[in-house]
Amino acid sequence: MQNLQEKKIAIVCDWIKDWGGAEIVLEQMLEIFPNADIFTSIFFGGKKDIFKNRVIKTSFIQNIPVLNKSHKLALFFRPLAFESFDLSSYDIVISSTSAESKGVITKPETLQICYCHTPTRYFWSHYHEYINMMEFGFLNPIGKWLMPKIVHNLRIWDFVASKRPDYFIANSENTAKRIKKYYNRESEVIYPCLDIENIPFSNEKEDYYFYNGRCIPYKKFDLIVDAFNENGKKIKIATNTDNKLYRELKEKSNSNIEWILTNDLDLINKLHSKAKAFLFPPEEDFGLVPIAAMASGTPVIAYGRGGALETVVSGITGVFFEEQNEISLNKTIDYFEKMNFDSEKIRNHAMSFDKKMFRKNLIEFINKKLEN
């Protein structure tokens, strides 16, 4: 570890704006490498302690109004932004990415590692979904007309950029398969982790279900609302995203659905710990939120695809629903309510995703590559 701390390290990420799973991974990397500098297209990370006294270098996009507020609009400029960064003085460059930041250019002697949350979704696996759910407002028609005409060249750039890292780390087996499919690169899996020991645990559950996350289309808040409008059961939904979708779904919700607009992590953890079950309807590349729920002793009802298959153990820490619709979800909720779960076993399973494991595995990986 002493060797590593003597190296000059840069951590590159796509953008720092909202706080989600990728940002939690970034935070843990910064704890592991307290002297690392940050490179990112835009930074609106607020006053979090982890960024205090830290060198943070942003791209030209930071100074362009409108673009600096919309990472979707800025996607056309990010390849240039990341290729413009001067990383020539760094010994190790680590990109934590689901988009373009893997495309930074380094010197031949620099060890460049990509921690990949997913190959760029809007170029590859979820291209058609993104086309159909653009959030450009009045510019949506232009985006839908333009994107099909330029996506081929963007895919070529993304594929070329995927050859720049010396090594890939995948955040899940699910992501590793995508990295192989779209980039033809091998990767080693190191799971993202949470500070499990500091997540409150409770054996006592109350009569409500719970879901939280950013209120954006692929997180499937609409599925939750449709299912619970139908079944009439109590659910609390927490989000930090006050947008058009949030307001539309809140208006559509029946009285059994309680919306909570909050950034308060302590409140979120408390809601996790008291819920009878946490719902997880999206197909995620990995998904840290179900781990937070399980750490609190709460079982998970998850869509049976993607990263949830690597974290939730059916019948022990939760159950899966087979189709991404309200009929399948409600059928599984009815099945879940006839089951019994051991909160202690659920918590113990979550401990395998504690941040100490992430730290150990990442340091071992980098040291091994330095020896090569």
Indicate residue ranges for each PLM-predicted region:
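Short alpha-helical donor nucleotide-sugar binding micro-motif in glycosyltransferases
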Residues: 270-275, 362
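Conserved donor-binding/catalytic core segment of Leloir-type glycosyltransferases
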Residues: 200-219, 225-238
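Membrane-proximal helix-turn-helix segments that form the acceptor-binding/catalytic region
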Residues: 135-168, 176
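Acidic donor-binding loop of glycosyltransferase active sites
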Residues: 273-285, 298
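Active-site donor-binding segments of glycosyltransferases and PAPS-dependent sulfotransferases
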Residues: 35-102
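A charged, aromatic-enriched C-terminal amphipathic alpha-helix characteristic of glycosyltransferases
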Residues: 80, 324-327, 337-369
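Short hydrophobic beta-strand element within catalytic cores of glycosyltransferases
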Residues: 299-303, 312
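Nucleotide-activated donor-binding/catalytic signature segment of Leloir-type glycosyltransferases, i.e.
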Residues: 246-266
